[in-house]
């Protein structure tokens, strides 16, 4: 799997949402290898999209379509500033990945010097995590070449997510969390929406 994260300031949110809906309706059918996406606006007006493709080649082929270029130009017009793009070939799934049933999504951006340690945290003893935090439906961990990461976590709802945050994990888990999340930035999507192929 390949993940591209797109982020930028946007106060014209209704227009941006309409354009994203147009992409789903008109362009997605021709986007070979497109798997889906998670989108939302943060409280401070950032539009975030986490888009999944089968491979980098599929994502690049989509970017090179003329109709994609035309759509991107329209999208740029409703943004308040330039958009950031982050491309990640290194993707790890938490449980079965994200969930289109999520009522709340948290995007975490950070950087680690040992990505394998972070990936191990996502895949080791997920049974214990599921028992401790049943409100977590799944997620994806996307890592860039420099160790920067984008973790997307899907929750049943925000109230249960906040309650779950108060649960103190075992000491070894706490140690790994402290390592991974040191200096990380959290983006809350209170009203996320989803697209799937």
Residue ranges of predicted features:
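Short S/T/G/P-rich N-terminal loop/turn motif that feeds into the first structured element of a domain
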Residues: 1-48, 52-197
């Amino acid at each position: 799997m390949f993940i591209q994260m797109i982020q930028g300031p946007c106060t014209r949110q209704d227009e941006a949402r309409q354009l994203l809906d147009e992409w789903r309706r008109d362009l997605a059918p021709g986007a070979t290898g497109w798997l889906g996406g998670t989108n939302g606006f943060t409280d401070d007006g950032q539009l975030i999209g986490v888009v999944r493709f089968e491979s980098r080649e599929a994502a690049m082929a989509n970017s090179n379509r003329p109709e994609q270029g035309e759509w991107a130009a329209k999208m740029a017009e409703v943004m308040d500033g330039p958009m950031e793009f982050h491309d990640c070939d290194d993707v790890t799934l938490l449980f079965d990945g994200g969930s289109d049933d999520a009522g709340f999504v948290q995007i975490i951006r950070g950087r680690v010097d040992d990505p394998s340690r972070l990936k191990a945290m996502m895949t080791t003893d997920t049974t214990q995590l599921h028992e401790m935090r049943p409100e977590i439906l799944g997620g994806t961990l996307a890592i860039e070449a420099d160790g920067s990461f984008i973790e997307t976590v899907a929750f049943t709802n925000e109230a249960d997510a906040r309650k779950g945050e108060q649960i103190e994990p075992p000491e070894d888990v706490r140690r790994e969390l402290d390592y991974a999340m040191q200096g990380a930035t959290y983006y809350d999507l209170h009203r996320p929406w989803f697209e799937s192929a």
